Every structure is written in C-alpha cells, then in structure tokens.
Amino acid sequence: MKGKYFIPCLLLPTMMLASGGGGETDIVERTINFVIFIAIFYYLAADKIKAIFVARQESIAAELEKVQEKLKESKKAKEQAQKRFEESKRMAEDVILTAKKEVVLLTQKVEDSTKGDIENLIRQYNDSMEFEKRKAERAIIDEILAELFESDATKLDKSAYSEILLKKVA
C-alpha cells in the first residue's frame, strides 16, 4: 500500500521540473542529491523493511515446518494403514484357509455319516429279507405239515417227511 504512494511521490518532482528550458543540465548535482535522498531513505526505512522481510521469512519457515510436520504425520498414518492392510490381508487368508479346512472336515463327516446310514439301511434290508424268507419257509412248512397231518391216507415215516419238506423248500 505504501508502495502505491511512494512511486508517484518520487516521480512527481521529476514531472514538475521537466518543463525547464533548454539550459545547462546539472546532472552531477542531481545525482548527488539522489544518492543523498536514497541514503536518508535507507536510514529511515531500512530497519522497517528488514523487519518486514524477516517476519515474512519467519512466517514462511513456520508454514514450511507445519507442512513438513503434516507430511510426517501423513507418512506415519500411511505406514500404519499399510500395516493394518497387510494384517487384514493375512487374517483374511487365515480365515479362508480355516474355512477350506472346515469344509473338508464337514464333507468327510457327512460322507462318513451317509456311508454309515447306507450300511445300516442295507443291513436292515438284508435282515428284513432274511426274516421274510424264514417267515415264508415256515408258512410253507406249516402248510405242508398241515396237509400231511390232515390226510390220514398216507402214513409216512420221518424220512419221508424230511424228503417232502426238502422238495417243497427247494
């Protein structure tokens, strides 16, 4: 803001005095006056300008330090996230492996149980068939014996009964 007013103040005397005649130029005196003006200006404003630049430098350094601190924090957060990701990945692999093992075990258990059930059903079927076979044999034997005992016409001995039974059963 001060710069906006400072530059026109420097140029204003030059414009006002530029309308002079074509006389002799006093360039040496003007140069000496300009150097004196710059020296006075430097004497009065140098500390303030230095303070402005130092303050600006310090604010930039502080801002840079904050940015570096945030960068370090974000790197730490990234590393932690990467570690958590790797751990989660490892845990997921463990869960998958465990699930596969459980599937194999459950499949084996179901197969064993099913085989046992099938063997029991086959055994029950065979026992039932054997029982029905014996039942049918007894019924046939009872029928034959009933016929033989009812018919008094034929008097047979034990060997004849045995032969008749064997023929009927076979």
Swiss-Prot record:
GO MF annotation list: proton-transporting ATP synthase activity, rotational mechanism
Topological relation to the membrane, as annotated: Single-pass membrane protein
Record flagged with keyword Translocase: no
Broad class of the protein's primary localization: membrane
Entry keyword Ion transport: yes
Family: Belongs to the ATPase B chain family.
Record function comment: F(1)F(0) ATP synthase produces ATP from ADP in the presence of a proton or sodium gradient. F-type ATPases consist of two structural domains, F(1) containing the extramembraneous catalytic core and F(0) containing the membrane proton channel, linked together by a central stalk and a peripheral stalk. During catalysis, ATP synthesis in the catalytic domain of F(1) is coupled via a rotary mechanism of the central stalk subunits to proton translocation. Component of the F(0) channel, it forms part of the peripheral stalk, linking F(1) to F(0).
Protein name: ATP synthase subunit b
Organism phylogeny: Bacteria, Pseudomonadati, Campylobacterota, Epsilonproteobacteria, Campylobacterales
